[in-house]
Amino acid sequence: MARVKRALNAQKKRRTVLKASKGYRGQRSRLYRKAKEQQLHSLTYAYRDRRARKGEFRKLWISRINAAARANDITYNRLIQGLKAAGVEVDRKNLAELAVSDPAAFTALVDVARAALPEDVNAPSGEAA
């Protein structure tokens, strides 16, 4: 079997790894082995966090909806329950966008949800006893 010299291929491989690890700190951007290890970790973190990002956005939307709902004297839980009872199919992303950009429309949705909710006997009344 013929001998294979890897000089050019090895140089190209090292160059691509070092180019990809340009912004890393210390040896991780200068030494091939450290750069390769860091690149493996970085790709793993990127893969993991692309999935985690979806949950983080959902948390953000829920906290925005809750803040806007409480400004309209209803909790997030009761708002979602009322919207489901009223048959309004709007996802949390669009609901959060409405809460931020169009408060009047959000208030209208809150009124629809409030009308669809059954009257809660344990809820405190508006009158002082």
UniProtKB/Swiss-Prot annotation:
rRNA-binding as UniProt keyword: yes
Domain of life of the source: Bacteria
PROSITE patterns hit by this protein: RIBOSOMAL_L20
A biological process from GO: ribosomal large subunit assembly
InterPro entries, per the entry: Ribosomal_bL20 (IPR005813), RIBOSOMAL_L20_CS (IPR049946), Ribosomal_protein_bL20_C (IPR035566)
Pfam families: Ribosomal_L20
Keywords carried by this UniProt record: Ribonucleoprotein, Ribosomal protein, RNA-binding, rRNA-binding
GO CC annotation: ribonucleoprotein complex; ribosome
The keyword Ribonucleoprotein belongs to this UniProt entry's keyword annotation: yes
Similarity comment: family membership: Belongs to the bacterial ribosomal protein bL20 family.
Protein name per Swiss-Prot or TrEMBL: Large ribosomal subunit protein bL20
Gene that encodes it: rplT
